[in-house]
Amino acid sequence: MSYFVSPQSHLGLLPSGQGGAASSGSSLGLYSPAEPVVVAPGGLGPLSQKAEQVAPAAQAWGPTLAVPEARGCSGGVSWETPRRKEHNRYCPKLPPMRPLESLGWADPCSRSRAPYLGGPSRPRPLLLCGLSPGVLPISSEAGGKEAASQPDICILTLAMMIAGIPTVPVPGLREEDLIRAAQAFMMAHPEPEGAVEGVQWEQAHAHAHMASGQMPLVRSRRGSCL
């Protein structure tokens, strides 16, 4: 069996500067748990042979294991990370690490640095879930193209409605937009004088039939889809 002995009972094993939890009058006591001393049953001294057997077993794992090293912190023992050169010796295929600034990324850990001052020619680095710079370009011409293509959609929708083709509701397209697009199209493409007179005759004929209670006869114009 092994015992925890006080420094007063075995003065030859421990220096006098290390204090224990046992009293000065007792021969056996509880030593400080931070510094245990293993004593052989015969009282011949500490078992240094077992400690020597444990040390090669720990070294057999190589330098990849973290080695506890006493630091200046008050918390106790801290763990030392493996060195880069030793890691590269066991893993030569891994490329060397480069700083984030060389890749065009801002370091999120450095809050004391100056803000990024980028011009229009240099895109601002993105910090969104691993997206690289330039993945989400914001173009100022997108709004202009969308506004320019909306009258074309209105005219196409009107033409399909006149031709009797079933249309699909366009999101964001209102009835006022259709009316404005039809008016702009009629102003940009005026009809010839004969066609205007025919339209006026049809309207007058329709009003006359409606006044007499008869159904008007619709005459199709040349070149129309009806």
Curated annotation (Swiss-Prot):
<dbReference type="GO" id="GO:0007283">
    <property type="term" value="P:spermatogenesis"/>
</dbReference>
<comment type="similarity">
    <text>Belongs to the SPATA25 family.</text>
</comment>
<dbReference type="InterPro" id="IPR029192">
    <property type="entry name" value="SPATA25"/>
</dbReference>
<keyword id="KW-0472">Membrane</keyword>
<dbReference type="Pfam" id="PF15218">
    <property type="entry name" value="SPATA25"/>
</dbReference>
<keyword id="KW-0744">Spermatogenesis</keyword>
<feature type="transmembrane region" description="Helical">
    <location>
        <begin position="153"/>
        <end position="173"/>
    </location>
</feature>
<keyword id="KW-0221">Differentiation</keyword>
<dbReference type="GO" id="GO:0016020">
    <property type="term" value="C:membrane"/>
</dbReference>
<dbReference type="GO" id="GO:0030154">
    <property type="term" value="P:cell differentiation"/>
</dbReference>
<keyword id="KW-1133">Transmembrane helix</keyword>
<keyword id="KW-0812">Transmembrane</keyword>
<protein>
    <recommendedName>
        <fullName>Spermatogenesis-associated protein 25</fullName>
    </recommendedName>
</protein>
<comment type="function">
    <text>May play a role in spermatogenesis.</text>
</comment>
